[in-house]
C-alpha cells in the first residue's frame, strides 16, 4: 500500500510519455523505467498486486520522479541513458552483458553495416543505442534492403547472393566507386536522424507498382517496411547531433515560486537532470541569472563547452563571466530540448502547489473540520493524553501536542504517576496528570491549548473536566477519542452529556484524530515499557543479598540489562567497586534465574 506522500504524487502524474525514477528511503535510484503514459504505468505499481522482484522493488519505493518527453521513442533513449548513468539495482538484468547495441558503418574502402556493443574512435559512424539486439537487427536489415552497402566478405570474382537480392553494391566482383558509398551513407545518416519523407515516397511508389503488377507478396513486404518507419524511426530529439558537452537551463515561474530544470548533455545524450524549486523575491530573470552564476561557482562544476538558455536572459553577460558560449536556440532539436525542460519545470511546480494544498488540507484544514464538527471556534493547539500500565503495575501517562495539525514533539511530556500505585484507576490517573499539567501552566503563566483530547470515554472526560473546572477554574474543551471493538478510531465524545460526534471516516479531520490517537498511544506505551523494564531490573537485583541502591545503580549504569550483568565475569563485577563475595553472589543468582527462565520456556 502506498504512503500518503506517494498517493498524493500518484494523483498528480501526467498523461504523457516519459521516464520514471523509483527511489528508496535513502534517496537512491533503485529502478528506472519508461512509459507511453506515465500516469497509467507508475500507478500500476501501487494499485495492483505483484510478486517476486517487482513486489520487492515496490516495497522499497519511498519516492519517485518523472521526466516528461515528447514521444515514447525519446522515453526509451532517455531510459537507457539513465540506467547506464545510475546503474539501478532493480535494472540489473538490463546491465548484464556487453551493453546496449549500436549500428555501425565501418571506415573501410568498401564499408559495411554491422551491430556492435561499444563505440570506438575508429572513424566509423555509430547510431543508437538500441534497446536490444533484435531492435538493432531490425533496423540494420531494413537499411540493408533500402540503402545497401557491402554485405559480403569482399571481392570473390563473382556476384554474391545479396547482390542479386539488391542488398549489396557489388564489392564481391567489382570496384564500387567511393562516391556511391558516400551517397548511400549520407542517405542512411539522414534516415536514422528521422528524415524519412524521401524513402517513404520511394517505398510507396514501389508498393503501388508491385500491386499493379500483381506482385502482392512484394507489395506486402514493402508495406511492412513503411509500417516499420512509421512506428520505429522517429526524430530523436533527446539525442543531439554532435557530442559537444552542453548544460541546458529553463524555468517556469508562478505564484512567487521559481521552478528550474537543468539538463546535462554529454556524448550526445541527456546524461542527467536536476531540478530546483524555491520561492523568489526578485524577477524571474534576475533570480535565474543569479542561480546560474552561483550554480557553477558553488558546485565548482567543470564548465561545459556550451550553455543553452531560454530567451530573455542576459546571455552575453553570463558568457563573459563564465567564459563559455551561451546561446538561445531558435530552431531544431536544441530548441525542442529547451521546450521539454520548460514543460518539466511547469509540471514540477504544479505538483509542488498541489502537494502544498494537500498538506494544508491534512493540517490546518483538518483542524477546521474537527472544530466545525464540535461547534468550536477555529483552534490551533491540541494536547492529548493517554495512560499505560500492566495490570496496574508501573502506571504512567503521556501527553502529545499537535499544532496546526502537525505533531510538535518538543512539547511532548511524560508522567510517572504518583497517586496511583499498583492498581488501575483511569479516573485517578486522569485527575493527576491533568492537575499536574495545567496547574503548572497556570503557575508559569503559559498559554493553554485550544482543546484537550483524552484517549478513552466518559470516565476520562468527566475526570478531566472536573479538575479543570472545579479545581483550576479553566474552561478548555475536553474531547474523548473513542475506539471500536477492533481497537480502531471510531468517533469523538463531546459536550455536557458526552454525546457522540461522527466524523466522515474518509475526511482529513478523521485522519487527524486517528493520527493523534495513535501517536499518544505509541508515546505512552513506549514510555511504560522503559519504566517497567527498569523497575523489573531493579526488583531482581534488590532480591540479591548485599545489593543496595548504590550497587544496583552501578550495575545498571555499566551493563544496562540483567542479561549483560549475568554475562559479566566475577572480576568484571568486582572491578566496579563491589566486594568479591557480593560479586560472586550476583553472578550465581543471575545465572540461576537465567537457567530457570530457560527451562520454563520449553514447557
UniProtKB/Swiss-Prot annotation:
BP terms from Gene Ontology: nucleotide-excision repair; SOS response
Start and end residues of each UVR domain: 197-232
PROSITE patterns registered for this protein in UniProt: GIY_YIG, UVR, UVRC
Residues of the GIY-YIG domain: 15-92
Assembly information from the UniProt record: Interacts with UvrB in an incision complex.
Its job: The UvrABC repair system catalyzes the recognition and processing of DNA lesions. UvrC both incises the 5' and 3' sides of the lesion. The N-terminal half is responsible for the 3' incision and the C-terminal half is responsible for the 5' incision.
Protein name as it appears in the record: UvrABC system protein C
Organism the protein comes from: Limosilactobacillus reuteri (strain DSM 20016)
Taxonomic classification: Bacteria, Bacillati, Bacillota, Bacilli, Lactobacillales
Amino acid at each position: 500500500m502506498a504512503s500518503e506522500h506517494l498517493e498524493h504524487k500518484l494523483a498528480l502524474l501526467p498523461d504523457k510519455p516519459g521516464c520514471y525514477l523509483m527511489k528508496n528511503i535513502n534517496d537512491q535510484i533503485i529502478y528506472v523505467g519508461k512509459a507511453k503514459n506515465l500516469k497509467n504505468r507508475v500507478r500500476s505499481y501501487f494499485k495492483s498486486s505483484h510478486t517476486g522482484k517487482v513486489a520487492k522493488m515496490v516495497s522499497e519505493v519511498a519516492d519517485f520522479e518523472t521526466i516528461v518527453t515528447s514521444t515514447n521513442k525519446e522515453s526509451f533513449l532517455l531510459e537507457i541513458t539513465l540506467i547506464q548513468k545510475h546503474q539501478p539495482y532493480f535494472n540489473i538484468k538490463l546491465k548484464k552483458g556487453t551493453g546496449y547495441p549500436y549500428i555501425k558503418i565501418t571506415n573501410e574502402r568498401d564499408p559495411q553495416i554491422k551491430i556492435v556493443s561499444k563505440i570506438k574512435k575508429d572513424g566509423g559512424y555509430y547510431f543508437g543505442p538500441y534497446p536490444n539486439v533484435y531492435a538493432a537487427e531490425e533496423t540494420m536489415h531494413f537499411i540493408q534492403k533500402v540503402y545497401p552497402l557491402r554485405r559480403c566478405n569482399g571481392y570473390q570474382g563473382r556476384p554474391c547472393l545479396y547482390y542479386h537480392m539488391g542488398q549489396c553494391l557489388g564489392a564481391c566482383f567489382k570496384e564500387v566507386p567511393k562516391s556511391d558509398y558516400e551517397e548511400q551513407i549520407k542517405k542512411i545518416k539522414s534516415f536514422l536522424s528521422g528524415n524519412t519523407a524521401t524513402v517513404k515516397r520511394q517505398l510507396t511508389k514501389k508498393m503501388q507498382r508491385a500491386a499493379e503488377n500483381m506482385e502482392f507478396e512484394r507489395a506486402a513486404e514493402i508495406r511492412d517496411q513503411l509500417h516499420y518507419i512509421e512506428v520505429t524511426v522517429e526524430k530523436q530529439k533527446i539525442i543531439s547531433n554532435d557530442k559537444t558537452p552542453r548544460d541546458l537551463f529553463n524555468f517556469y515561474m508562478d505564484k512567487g515560486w521559481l521552478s528550474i530544470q537543468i539538463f546535462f548533455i554529454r556524448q550526445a545524450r541527456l546524461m542527467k537532470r536536476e531540478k530546483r524549486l524555491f520561492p523568489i523575491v526578485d524577477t524571474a530573470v534576475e533570480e535565474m541569472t543569479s542561480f546560474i552564476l552561483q550554480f557553477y561557482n558553488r558546485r565548482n562544476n567543470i564548465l561545459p563547452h556550451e550553455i543553452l538558455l531560454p530567451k530573455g536572459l542576459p546571455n552575453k553577460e553570463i558568457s563573459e563571466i563564465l567564459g563559455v558560449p551561451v546561446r538561445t536556440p531558435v530552431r531544431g532539436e536544441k530548441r525542442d530540448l529547451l521546450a521539454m525542460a520548460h514543460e518539466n519545470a511547469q509540471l514540477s511546480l504544479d505538483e509542488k502547489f498541489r502537494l502544498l494544498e494537500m498538506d494544508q488540507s491534512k493540517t490546518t484544514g483538518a483542524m477546521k473540520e474537527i472544530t466545525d464538527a464540535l461547534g468550536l471556534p477555529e483552534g490551533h493547539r491540541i494536547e492529548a493524553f493517554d495512560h499505560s500500565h500492566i495490570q496496574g503495575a508501573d502506571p504512567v501517562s503521556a501527553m502529545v501536542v499537535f499544532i496546526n495539525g502537525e505533531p510538535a514533539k518538543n512539547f511532548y511530556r511524560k508522567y510517572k504517576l504518583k497517586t496511583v500505585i499498583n492498581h488501575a484507576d483511569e479516573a485517578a490517573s486522569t485527575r493527576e496528570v491533568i492537575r499536574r499539567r495545567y496547574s503548572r501552566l497556570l503557575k508559569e503563566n503559559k498559554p493553554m491549548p485550544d482543546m484537550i483530547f483524552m484517549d478513552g470515554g466518559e470516565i476520562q472526560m468527566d475526570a478531566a473536566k472536573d479538575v479543570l473546572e472545579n479545581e483550576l477554574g479553566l474552561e478548555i474543551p475536553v474531547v474523548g477519542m473513542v475506539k471500536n471493538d477492533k481497537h480502531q478510531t471510531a468517533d469523538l465524545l463531546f459536550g455536557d452529556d458526552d454525546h457522540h460526534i461522527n466524523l466522515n471516516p474518509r475526511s482529513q479531520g478523521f485522519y487527524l484524530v486517528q493520527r493523534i490517537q495513535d501517536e499518544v498511544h505509541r508515546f505512552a506505551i513506549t514510555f511504560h515499557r522503559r519504566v517497567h523494564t527498569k523497575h523489573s531490573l531493579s526488583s531482581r537485583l534488590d532480591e540479591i543479598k548485599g545489593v543496595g541502591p548504590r550497587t544496583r545503580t552501578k550495575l545498571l549504569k555499566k551493563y544496562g540489562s540483567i542479561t549483560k550483568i549475568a554475562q559479566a565475569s566475577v572480576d568484571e563485577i568486582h572491578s566496579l567497586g563491589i566486594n568479591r563475595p557480593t560479586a560472586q553472589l550476583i553472578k550465581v543468582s543471575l545465572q540461576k534465574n537465567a537457567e530457570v527462565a530457560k527451562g520454563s520456556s520449553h514447557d
